[in-house]
Amino acid sequence: MNELTLIDFYLCFLAFLLFLVLIMLIIFWFSLEIQDLEEPCTKV
């Protein structure tokens, strides 16, 4: 019985970590896109 609760907690924790990683990747990609858009403007 305790094993099931531990497994559920572990799965929820993994899902939460994956969610955080996805958010960080999206923010990182978004910041890179913004830099790519700003760089040509400053160069020209």
Swiss-Prot record:
One Gene Ontology cellular component: host cell membrane
Pfam families: bCoV_NS7B
Recorded topology in the membrane: Single-pass membrane protein
Keyword Nucleotide-binding: no
Subcellular location(s) of the protein: Host membrane
UniProt superkingdom: Viruses
Transmembrane intervals: 9-29
Xref: InterPro entries: NS7B_bCoV, ORF7b_SARS-CoV-like
This protein's record includes keyword Membrane: yes
Keywords, comma-separated and alphabetical: Host membrane, Membrane, Transmembrane, Transmembrane helix
Name under which the protein is recorded: Protein non-structural 7b
Organism, scientific name: Severe acute respiratory syndrome coronavirus
